[in-house]
């Protein structure tokens, strides 16, 4: 037999539940309305940005290039391949020599003291889903790169591409490249919230969507055997402090200085992927993430996505089990530092 208290509780629930249902519907409606509004604004911003690119003389066609570096060095040639979007192409750099591809190939050649062939199959305006076509172009060339660098994510944010979908295509690309014997370095999505032409609240929305995508990219890259390097700093504090210097004239892409900063962050990881360390230094100490430890993988990846030039790579524990993930500031490669670890 029910007590008076139980009856009152049941009645209260009967009264509250419909109100909660109505409130949920109202919240869902507001959320849907906000999402729709952001979607419309984002699409308009994307069309506007595309118009600026076309007006500046950029196209959405492939600009596949092949260049050789360090021909005066002896030894077998290293194959370096770039895939991705306009950042991989070098839109806004002003000259081929200032693009991230040229800077990485030149730096790798000097570090390895071997000739390097750079093959760039990136396409301006590409989203993660279009990596499939770039992989096909690479397969048609029958090239097996030693190191492949992927720079993608900004257009996924601009076009509100679903994060799971973007991650699926990136994971596929990393798997395919690994099967071809390449070591893969992925520059995770930059913070699109720092692009000045975007207005609030779109800038705030782009900021958090960029972080979520970068976190997801880090996880899927690790799970498929690649290296993930945060490029948040390429449009981070230094871009806020000196936008006229770090952004190109279109205010959307990095300038030559901006690309130089990106290459500075990426180069140590590219060299390490090829089996070389810069400046003759030893191994850099790793911050360790332990599976089942205090923080989940998603938290660790999110923290990495917020730190300038942080590289995350798969690692193993002292028993050889793949239970760890290790990260290090990419720009610290080659420096002799005390050997310390953080759980």
What are these regions (language model features)?
Residues 96, 161-165, 169, 201-212, ...:
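Alpha-helix N-cap and loop-to-helix initiation/capping positions
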Residues 91, 160, 196-200, 242-246:
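Short acidic, glycine/proline-rich loop/turn micro-motifs
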